[in-house]
From Swiss-Prot:
Protein known as: Trans-cinnamate 4-monooxygenase
E.C. designation(s): 1.14.14.91
Gene Ontology cellular component annotations, sorted alphabetically: membrane
TM ranges: 3-23
Pathways per UniProt: Alkaloid biosynthesis; Phenylpropanoid metabolism; trans-4-coumarate biosynthesis; trans-4-coumarate from trans-cinnamate: step 1/1
Amino acid sequence: MDLILLEKSLLAVFFAVIFSIIVSKLRGKKLKLPPGPFPVPVFGNWIQVGDDLNHRNLAGLAKKFGDIFLLRMGQRNLVVVSSPDLARDVLHTHGVEFGSRTRNVVFDIFTGKGQDMVFTVYGEHWRKMRRIMTVPFFTNKVVNQYRFGWEEEAARVVEDVKKDPMAAAEGIVLRRRLQLLMYNNMYRIMFDRRFESVDDPLFLKLTALNGERSRLAQSFEYNYGDFIPILRPFLRGYLKICKQVKERRFKLFKDYFLEERKKLASTKPTDNAGLKCAIDHILDAEKKGEINEDNVLYIVENINVAAIETTLWSIEWGIAELVNHPNVQQKLRNELDAVLGPGVQITEPDTYRLPYLQAVIKETLRLRMAIPLLVPHMNLYDAKLGSYDIPAESKILVNAWWLANNPAHWKDPQEFRPERFLEEEAKVEANGNDFRYIPFGVGRRSCPGIILALPILGITIGRLVQNFELLPPPGQDKLDTTEKGGQFSLHILKHSTIVAKPRVF
């Protein structure tokens, strides 16, 4: 069977080579394409650049080929943008033209070929899903309603760490407890639910499945079958696992969360006053026929991935940088004590009165951007970008990390220096008012979760620095902050063991 498959693949390669040469000659004469490495038939630049298209590798290619360059990855055109002006064109000036999302074989499984909001093409479905998700998740009213819960969850983290005798001595992997915090923050909003401990069986099952989903989706392992369709048969096993993980996750969402809310909805008023949490609004939209059950599940999918994981990565990065820069940590602690008073616990409204805390968050998002290439964009039709022709259905990557770390635009960008946002970059905000710094994207397809992420980061990091001296474990001068990049993500390769010595007030 494998021999037959190999023969068919080789035959397909032969015809694909001929087809690729013909198409290349026909298109190459009439299009002015961005520069880039010379492609070979069928494989394009895949053999030259490999699968690992992370932000640092792409920044290296930008130094060689310029602020816009083209990679032909098999049959896919990949355009990489690395300047503020071109980022403005993609995300804002021509935001509609480049406002769709690319598809790939794995995300087609996890999103039902774009039935969600984050990965759907630009159009009526996206507008509807964005509208339905915004009111229950992404408004100031939601922040005001749930910020007390975020403060409570942060207080519980502080108490749990204080109770752990290992924390002040050998240290603990704080990330596991912070993961519980983030799930509780978002599951309170979404389902009016929380988990009592990191050992909760349902929490363990949920995080295991979500972790497997992220590993499968973020891996570069499947790129060859996505870029070169004739090799896709070799992905059968991988895609089968993806389908199984999706089915198990969706069954868990339905059995343990959605069905419970549906039962509660049948026993309470159906007007807005009777709606307690976000999923009630979503289910109400389903009941009205605006969306179907699959759309509901894909909304839950988006929140589990896009809201929980990215904010968790940023919290983890922020703490690691503070441990490795004790002078910054102490300066932040001094601000908290001076503005709020020693031992007075930070609340969400306080975060806006703490400029150095805001600068620490901004600097974390600059240096360690959770989604360094943003979520890829796509033009449905032939388009222009700068002086170049962009063929229809090209994948457009904006290297937002390089925009924020290019020494041509930033002073000593490799340094973790929050002071830059109080000095030379004092007017730069995370909302995209400067296209050198767009950690949440800009425009129609920007991340609406910014309204939740920033206060959660402020409360969580603020409480930890207020209550503990955060140190590397015995025998280490610094934490290992080696990066682990994925299709979109940037997180720490090894979750850090951190010593947390309680402060006495």
